[in-house]
Every structure is written in structure tokens, then in C-alpha cells.
Amino acid sequence: MILIMIAIDNKLLTIEHVSREGGSHTMPAKHYHEGYEIYYLLEGERYYFIEDRTYRVRKGNLVLINKNILHRTIDTENPDHERILIEFHENFLKPYSKETKDISLYSIFKQKQFVYKLNVEEQLWLENHLFKMIKEKKSKNKGYVSYIRLLLIELLIYFNRQLKIDSISIVEYPDPTHEKMAEIASFISKNYNSDLSLKNVASLFNYSSTYLSRTFKQVTGFSFVEYKNNIRIKEARKLLQQTDLNISDISSMVGYNNLTHFGRIFKEITNYSPLNFRKLMSMKRSSK
């Protein structure tokens, strides 16, 4: 089993190289973050739930996740796999912001296409580049942090150039059941502030509550309630950061009628109370 975990510059960048065999390897349900994510599958297959749909990701596929996008990897029939994962905050590349003004490095993450099927040449280039980053951190030669920054910039420029080529195709739904659950997830995302119950949504889509509960969990990796709460809290985070609305109003706007319940769910997902989260975001803005 390969397990390499690297953190650089106060965790503004982390790199993981993991090979897993046997047993379940579904990632924790609460997963979206302030940084960008690059996920490359070296071996095996995974289901990857992103926002409101599930993709079957295969060997040689690349996944790019923007900031604050809800996502989760899920086991396929065979959970064995090997992958490299990079998570980074844009502040990691801030020292080179002047030198990269001629290109929008992060634009590729803002596309609605998340999963890319790379050809053999692109796979070889990417694998060589990722292992070069890992090797550089292990060696810790003089200037290694600066070099890793430059390697990451080169990687992002490569993505912005290559991933616009028409021959690179998106990986679609694994099967009709996944597509139907994606439709339901999309419905929840668009109507998160309504009184959504499992029973009502199941009835709307002509399913029994038991079937929807079981199948939604299998396909997305989230229970119905987990997904609904994550969508609501994600929207609440935006409102706390971008507006001066009071917390009670925000609670109602995202679908919670009980302020105490809202506070408990918010802290469960973010590890902060709504008030402390707002203070933290305000401090971060002031320090820029």
C-alpha cells in the first residue's frame, strides 16, 4: 500500500499519492473546501459525485474541482485503486501573481466539465509531472518550495491549453439510475430553501421513500438528509460571507425554520458556529 501525504507552506498545498486494496474506501461525506482540487486516477475505477451527478472515473481520467464544490468519491464494484490528489489554495501561488497576469490560471476549474479523459501522451506527461512534484518535496533541495510552485503553474497552464481540445471527452453518467439520481440531486440543489422531505421528493419522482433513500445513498455517497443539509449550509456560507444579513434571516432563507437546529447543522458541517464563521471570513478579508 502506497501512502504519501505531503503538506507545504502551512497546508496551502497538499499532495497525496495513495494506493488502496481491499475494503471500502468511500471518502467522508462532508467535503468541500476553500481550495482547488486536482484528482488523477492511476489505476482502478471510482465513482465521483460532483455537485449533483455521479461520474464513473477510470484509469487515466483527470478530475478538476473548483472551490466550494460539493464532491465525494465512492467505491465501484471493485474498490481497489491508486490515485494522486493535489489540493491547493490560490494563496500558494500568490508570490508569482505578477508573472502569471497573462493567463487566468484558475479558469479551467470554472468550467462545467469536471472529468476529462486523457489520451496516452497526456497521461504520460501528467504522471511524469505529478511524480516530479512529489520527488521535489521528498528531496527538499534548495528552493524546492519555489520549484513546486513553478511546477504547479506549469501544470495549470498545460490544463488551460490542452483541456480545451475537442478530442478530450467528458465521462458521462455510468447508467440510467445514476442519471435519475442526478436529476433528483439537481432538484434538491435548486429547491434547497423549500420544505423538502424524503417522502415528498420520493412521491414527486414516483419512488417509494425506502427505494429513494437507499438508491440515493448508493449513487451519491450521501444520505438524502446529508445532501440537503450540505447544499443548504453551502448557501448559508455564501450569505454569511457576502451579505450583512442577520443569522436568523439566513437560517430561514436556506430552509431552516429553527435557528438552533440551523446552528447545530452548520457547526457539524463547518466546525464553526455561524457567528464565528462570519468573524473568521471577515478577518481573512481584512488580512489580504
Model feature map: region roles:
Residues 112-122, 137-150, 156-190, 194, ...:
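Short, Lys/Arg-enriched, Trp-marked, Pro/Gly-tolerant hinge/linker segments that flank
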Residues 186, 190, 195, 199, ...:
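Terminal helix-turn-helix DNA-binding modules in bacterial transcription factors
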Residues 60, 211-216, 261-262, 266:
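Short hydrophobic/aromatic patch on the recognition helix
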Residues 2-21, 74-138, 157, 161-166:
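A hydrophobic/aromatic-rich effector-binding and dimerization subdomain
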Residues 42, 127-138, 185, 189-192, ...:
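Regular secondary-structure segments
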Residues 1-62, 69, 77, 98-105, ...:
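Generic protein-terminus/edge-of-domain signal
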